Amino acid sequence: MKIQDFDFDLPPELIAQFPAEKRGNSRMLHLDATSGALQDRMFADLPSYLRPGDVIVFNDTRVIKARLYGVRDTGGRVEVLVERVLDSHCALAAIRASHSPKPGSKLFLAGAIEVTVLSREHGFYILQFEHESGVMELLERYGNLPLPPYISRPVEKSDELRYQTVYAARPGAVAAPTAGLHFDEHMLGLLRKMGVVMAHVTLHVGSGTFQPVRVENIADHRMHSEVFYVSAETVECIRHAKAEGGRVLAVGTTSLRALEAAAAFAGERAEADNGDGVRIKCGAGETDIFITPGYQFRVVDCLLTNFHLPRSTLLMLVSAFGGVENIRCAYRHAIKERYRFFSFGDAMLIGRAEGI
């Protein structure tokens, strides 16, 4: 398919610059992927689509304060965005400066941290932090929250709370798994009382999630890699639910990618499916899984997501899940009805199973 198949015009005023006043006070567009039918709902209506024994899978990654400002050893200004912490003193990072720094050069960040540029690979730099404290501790102390590039306002103190899910537990992401931002403790408690099973995966969202696809043929796109983890407990929850007729709802494209990566991981190793028809394996690793129309989903029955950028890999993923023409119609409807788009925007529920 061509990149033009995933392009659309979005009025700038529909890009949400702030979250809803209260978590969960968002609209939700429901798409029945089988019939193509659309319903305008509220996020508070989510429980009406679920039943006891269903599994909701959340991404429990936590956004780190990954952005640092400083100067180079030449005196020029520099901005560093940590993409991934490699060990206690090294990180993979993007650097914005008037000229690309060379290996061996120094950066002085936040007035307190000396950093050595070790090497460059695939557009990122490997940096060594010359400090007795570890990278994570330094980021927490001196870093800034990395809001998405389409948020055209300064970071506010409230963003440290609202650009983080209430269940965030494992630091490592440079972007929030934004479908999860709609959930508050009240909604989670309500779902538990209903008998809906809560499960977690971890996928540390990288900055590549915001990058548009720049090739004409999407098959030529090189997908960014992200670290993920799927526990044995989550795998068992999914297998049990499927065996009993339950459905699996992935909260966000990152949860879906982690589950499908784990399923691909199992398939590569010819793992047995325990007779329940679900081939998925626990484990940790890196994934560059690129989900486009024609992909055969192995685990997920329904997807809760936000509205995505034109020409993005995430729009391709939801088009694969909900159907290309269905998603086009849904996005046209969302624009007409003035839904709020992107990270702080409204939700979309896409069902591929009976009853959702």
UniProtKB/Swiss-Prot annotation:
InterPro entries: QueA (IPR003699), QueA_dom1 (IPR042118), QueA_dom2 (IPR042119), QueA_sf (IPR036100). Pathway: tRNA modification; tRNA-queuosine biosynthesis. Transmembrane segments: none annotated. GO terms for molecular function: S-adenosylmethionine:tRNA ribosyltransferase-isomerase activity. One of its GO terms (biological process) is tRNA wobble guanine modification. Keywords: Cytoplasm, Queuosine biosynthesis, S-adenosyl-L-methionine, Transferase. The keyword Transmembrane does not apply. Belongs to the QueA family. Transfers and isomerizes the ribose moiety from AdoMet to the 7-aminomethyl group of 7-deazaguanine (preQ1-tRNA) to give epoxyqueuosine (oQ-tRNA). This is S-adenosylmethionine:tRNA ribosyltransferase-isomerase. It comes from Nitrosospira multiformis (strain ATCC 25196 / NCIMB 11849 / C 71).
